[in-house]
Amino acid sequence: MSDDQVLDCVIVGGGLAGLAAADRLRHRRVLVIEAADRVGGRIRSLPRGDYWLNLGAHMFGGPGTRIGDLAAELGLETRPIGRALIGMAMGGRRVFRGAVETFPFRLPLSVAARLSFIRMGLALRRGVAGAVHALGPRPGETAAEARARGLAWDNGATLAQRIGPLHPQIETILRAITERTGGDPAEMAAGYALRSFANVWSRHSPGCNLVGGSSLLPEALVRRIGDRILLGAEASAVEARDDVVTVACGSGSTARVVRARSAIVATPAFATKRIVRNLPPATAAALGAIRYGAFLSAAVLTDERSPMPWDRNYAISTPERAFSVVFDQASTLRGRGARAPGGSLMLFRGAKGAERLLQASDDQIASAFADDLAAEFPECRGRLREIVVQRWEAGAPFSFPGRAALQPALTMGLGPIFLAGDYLEFPNMEAAVATGWEAAEAVERRLVA
């Protein structure tokens, strides 16, 4: 593809939003520019025989969701998460089944801590009920309107403010179960956190796993997009002049300038602010105000020959450990027959806890996680075959009080440049695909005008 050619669209960023946009525009002359040596962004998995190691996003929507339908369209197999999403291991006690309302009475807590847990639970239940009522679909509402409404709901206070003072043990529990959303209770907006609880507090699984590992999705998109992806080419400038967008990327002998009639910038908010030239001041300020929380994950391949304590759970919270949650990535492979040997876990830490651990080396993190896993679950001692550490310094954009006020500046027209990414909505794979598709549709409308 010649640099003298004017493309229909250049897409900056090869994460899920960028790939989704490129896939929608694959009938056009497009080019995806990605700084890393692989696509997928925060989706990453590694095949390991009958299992796989998941290091990033792993919960897919089912049929009827954008991400679920896209996976099916690409011929990929997703399976419902048929295991409990709420379990806790704390103080030598395992509470893996039963209603969450019983946890205060089943965990080893003081009387004061039990009462604090109950107060927290009641506050969360009230908030979740409000979220379900307020965030339901409304007839005639556009996707952008629904997105803005979701961001604005209960956006004036943090989760910690909404719940009130807690016993120190319960503060630790709350931090552990909210870390996967990117922020701490004292940072994240109450509405954002309650929406996350609403997704999890269900008798039914909120999603599926992709059999074979999450990376199969971006890999399938790459096959369909074809050889129109440029890896290892970090964009340094995106600028619109006279209805032509120029993108400078690469450096030294690999430096090049790509020209196109339009551009979709699907990079994190802070990168978008850095590379897009001549942004309106309000948009630049809004992009700079988006906050990201760190994620740290360790994928663990195990070789056990007998059932393990996590077999009936998909997620187990571990408030007192170096990691805050254990995800059983092999759970969707467990049927009613004999249990196959081996397995795959993801050990996760997020927010401030992840930030602290990121100061250590990969070997130190792997050792700390392995020691704590064996301490919490002695059954796995000597059964850990491999540990792969993955650092996500910008793991997820989280909503904070006042975040909703930024949305108009983030969605205003920028001429031939369009923005996409999960920072525009509640951050998950569904949001990445939705914003990528919407940007692609806007490009298509511009091209045919």
Stretch-by-stretch model annotation:
Residues 7-32:
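N-terminal Rossmann-like FAD-binding beta1-loop-alpha1 element of flavoenzymes
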Residues 16-17, 39, 435:
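Hydrophobic/small residue at the entry helix of a nucleotide-binding pocket
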Residues 130-245:
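Active-site/ligand-binding neighborhood in enzyme catalytic cores
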Residues 4, 233-358, 375-376:
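Mid-domain catalytic core of redox enzymes
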Residues 4, 100, 310-312, 326-449:
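Conserved flavin/dinucleotide-binding core of flavoenzymes
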Residues 26-48:
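Glycine-rich FAD pyrophosphate-binding loop
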Residues 64, 267-268, 422:
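Glycine-rich, N-terminal phosphate-binding loop of Rossmann-like dinucleotide-binding domains
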Residues 51-134, 148-149:
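Dinucleotide-binding Rossmann-like beta1-alpha1 core, especially the glycine-rich loop
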